[in-house]
Amino acid sequence: MSTAAFHISSLLEKMTSSDKDFRFMATSDLMSELQKDSIQLDEDSERKVVKMLLRLLEDKNGEVQNLAVKCLGPLVVKVKEYQVETIVDTLCTNMRSDKEQLRDIAGIGLKTVLSELPPAATGSGLATNVCRKITGQLTSAIAQQEDVAVQLEALDILSDMLSRLGVPLGAFHASLLHCLLPQLSSPRLAVRKRAVGALGHLAAACSTDLFVELADHLLDRLPGPRVPTSPTAIRTLIQCLGSVGRQAGHRLGAHLDRLVPLVEDFCNLDDDELRESCLQAFEAFLRKCPKEMGPHVPNVTSLCLQYIKHDPNYNYDSDEDEEQMETEDSEFSEQESEDEYSDDDDMSWKVRRAAAKCIAALISSRPDLLPDFHCTLAPVLIRRFKEREENVKADVFTAYIVLLRQTQPPKGWLEAMEEPTQTGSNLHMLRGQVPLVVKALQRQLKDRSVRARQGCFSLLTELAGVLPGSLAEHMPVLVSGIIFSLADRSSSSTIRMDALAFLQGLLGTEPAEAFHPHLPILLPPVMACVADSFYKIAAEALVVLQELVRALWPLHRPRMLDPEPYVGEMSAVTLARLRATDLDQEVKERAISCMGHLVGHLGDRLGDDLEPTLLLLLDRLRNEITRLPAIKALTLVAVSPLQLDLQPILAEALHILASFLRKNQRALRLATLAALDALAQSQGLSLPPSAVQAVLAELPALVNESDMHVAQLAVDFLATVTQAQPASLVEVSGPVLSELLRLLRSPLLPAGVLAAAEGFLQALVGTRPPCVDYAKLISLLTAPVYEQAVDGGPGLHKQVFHSLARCVAALSAACPQEAASTASRLVCDARSPHSSTGVKVLAFLSLAEVGQVAGPGHQRELKAVLLEALGSPSEDVRAAASYALGRVGAGSLPDFLPFLLEQIEAEPRRQYLLLHSLREALGAAQPDSLKPYAEDIWALLFQRCEGAEEGTRGVVAECIGKLVLVNPSFLLPRLRKQLAAGRPHTRSTVITAVKFLISDQPHPIDPLLKSFIGEFMESLQDPDLNVRRATLAFFNSAVHNKPSLVRDLLDDILPLLYQETKIRRDLIREVEMGPFKHTVDDGLDVRKAAFECMYSLLESCLGQLDICEFLNHVEDGLKDHYDIRMLTFIMVARLATLCPAPVLQRVDRLIEPLRATCTAKVKAGSVKQEFEKQDELKRSAMRAVAALLTIPEVGKSPIMADFSSQIRSNPELAALFESIQKDSASAPSTDSMELS
């Protein structure tokens, strides 16, 4: 017998003792053993433990009973299934015992066992088998109404089972429904309440037929409001419908037109409990079926407005003293009794609370009605801030906060530049409400109730975030409220932290001048909080003090407030926190950060305290725990424009920082490099040379491609040091350059690192005398290309040539006197017949950059060389020469542009390359310098719009787009006219040209483009397929980059867009390829473009979409071509995250095409490509399934549950699903999709 088995055997023996203490201790020890992961019971031990614990459930001692029932939880996952069934059978029998205590213990035991069983989603069938076993016994217990206690326990357990395992119990759903429905008529409230909960869970999991039966039963039982019926019966039915709405509202949509008018009528009956139930049902319907509730929104809004004020027992005075209320006598009849309405009978607060929650659901589910809500709901909510019941007041605040969040304008530069009309109107209305809100909250901010004040702070924080600056004129009221809460030591610390957090937010949203008059009374309580003994308050107060310093005495603006009266106290209280050694880590870090801000912003006013403070920062720099915040604080001090004297700490700080560069901790390295760069910029020649050498010795190891960000900061620092102390670079320039040149040969070089390298190279040759000779640097840069030409080594990546060319140009710009000779040498290399392809490519790319610096010395020769290269057999040489011709031409338009236009006319075979050159010239030249040539270019381009090659037409379109930017107000109307005048290829080219006018950055053409965009979008009705495809690509670009251009047009555009998602049989044809027939769908590219537009709309215009209509077309796409299915799978996944409620309504229809894709088989004998395509389709479909499974209630769908079970039972699908879940966990941010 193993040790564990022997120990358990001895415990079982003790459990038979007559001494209750022995039995209790033995059961407690058994509990400890069962909770160990390592314990394994043999079959005999299992049987004995189960038998003993079931026996102890009937123990005479209650404490032993309770401990035994707790042991069942860990036991059921350690024993075999038949033992679990034995436990469950015994518990079910005990539930029907005559002994009340045993019944109670059995009920608790069943709940414990069910809660510990592994869920069905894990693939274990244990829970399902156990639940099936006890369902029959539970239904019989519920049906026999002899013992209400047994009924209640059984209903509780059944409700719990249905919530966790509703779908696997499908075989019992019909019997459960017929068992539960009669309980709605039970005379006992508790039975009715539990039956309502169980029916809600059943409604979410049952089949469609059973759900219809349930809904019809409930609706048929609902009488008309004038039919005499028991109020209790009506209440129960409405509560049941509300429960069904909450659990399975997505299935109730089809019944709402019949149901909602009845519930509206019942709301008007004089029964507050019934009103509460009706409003709760409306809330559920609005959240789960917002589209179907659309026609009923006006009536529901009216009822909410009526009942949020429903307080028959009180009269709120209308004068300023809103806290004094006056009670009136009133009669209230409830269930045929006529008693005086007293506070004890007052149920009206529940009605008001339900109305407030329903209003919150209204606002969140119908963002399209926001302007109406601002007019109708907002004033009423503001007036109800005076609500006397704390719970109701909290929900009123929540409802107004939901309104604020819906009003929040979309984030990003575009909306900041140009608010959409609707958003601007909403913000304007909200701005008018601000004085009313502040007035309504003035007394609440000093309310005795902590919860009321917390609600005020939350609401005002949201308001400040939506309308920054709007609270400035109300600062006296707000400061008074903040001080009241900061001084409140009688309540919990939470309210003081909330007040500090609110103040911190205000400092970020309101202008600094608003705080100036209040600082004398505001600063003392903040500093008292800094010194508070509770670490969380101290940490929060230090952040506020830091924000005060940053906001009131900004670095780069004149000081509008004299800091002298405050700086001493602020410094003293922060230093006290900084010096303490036994502090919480968070307080230490925030004290260091706060001191960094104090020194950086007000160091010139610290006087004699400055040096001790700096030394204290240096001490924190030595400490491993505080070194990271100390580095950041030192950086703040270094970048300060106050030019503080850092000599007392400089040498030692540099040596410490140098040691950090050796640490294998990325965050530390990045912070250290930022600090070093700041110190080099601010201190320059003051840096001790020996300390600088110690730092520089660590840098070569950091300049490599293993961490590009670290490399970029290291090179930036090198450039700064080169300018500040050139002599320091003498010893390390060799190793550093060696690493930098290796880095420049990386094909993955980011733009930031390249820019840093250019700056460093310019610094090296820009010093006097230069640290490294210009000619030597050029030689080092170009050596890899020339060496490759000699030894025939592996070719460099194309991107490397561009990087090297940029560096050559940077050096030429830093040494203009050398530029001409460099250009001459490059021309020779490009012309030489002995030069390799790589040398020529580098020469042309370098000329493209250097040519604009070198001047006109070699232009004639250069033209000839470039033209000759356009005929090179090497595609890379031709492309580089084309690029160089355009870039050099942009620097000398009078010489090059007429020549380039002549060549385009004269050389039709080289037209594509020459048009690329023209595109580069148009993009690089100044608009004003191009105006004299605009007409000639315009005519030339439109002559080439009808070219046969689509690639050439694409370049022509891009050239037209760049040309329009030269003179938008004149050329954009001309471009629009070409739509009517041109043939199909011309129309397509014009639309593509307009696409190139849209960038992801603000541009002066945007307002003009917006005024014309509707006319360009009319091309969606063009009879030509290619024109419609080009228009969809243009629309997609607008939606993706500048959604405000098209938002106002969506009502007209969306029907046309959806039309393009349909498969058109007249565009499908058969093509014979030898003995085979091949189907060609000419409409595929247009459909694909339409679905790409739909995806982009999800990201930027979600609020303007009718998601139910949108989903109709997504469903069609799920059965379309491979490319479109891939797109719609991604859309389904995104929709599951963005708007789960409407997706849940359609989940049964969405699952079938996903299942079909996941289970599809490739025909035997298919090529490898077909297998790869099918695998990719399966992965994409499974990602969509995984996203659908994140919707909280989706598991209750029978079809989804069936498919989940199919996935688990199929090894291939299970492995795929597991792989996708791992991918999602490791890379959660997969929201965006690159679309061509």
UniProtKB/Swiss-Prot annotation:
GO MF term set: TBP-class protein binding
Record-linked Pfam families: HEAT_EZ, TIP120
Location within or outside the cell: Nucleus
Modified residue annotations for N-acetylserine: 2
Biased composition (Acidic residues): 317-346
Tissue: Expressed in epididymis (at protein level).
PTM statement from Swiss-Prot or TrEMBL: Ubiquitinated and targeted for proteasomal degradation.
Keyword line: Acetylation, Nucleus, Repeat, Transcription, Ubl conjugation, Ubl conjugation pathway
Any GO BP annotation: protein ubiquitination
Sequence segments annotated as region (Disordered): 315-346
Coiled coil feature spans: none
HEAT repeat start and end residues: 2-39, 44-81, 83-119, 129-167, 171-208, 210-246, 254-291, 327-368, 372-409, 432-469, 517-554, 565-604, 608-645, 648-685, 690-727, 731-770, 772-813, 857-894, 896-931, 933-966, 967-1003, 1007-1044, 1048-1084, 1105-1141, 1157-1194, 1204-1236
Tree of life domain: Eukaryota
Main localization (coarse): nucleus
UniProt record similarity statement: Belongs to the CAND family.
Complexes and interactors: Binds TBP, CNOT3 and UBE3C.
Protein's UniProt name: Cullin-associated NEDD8-dissociated protein 2
Gene (UniProt): CAND2
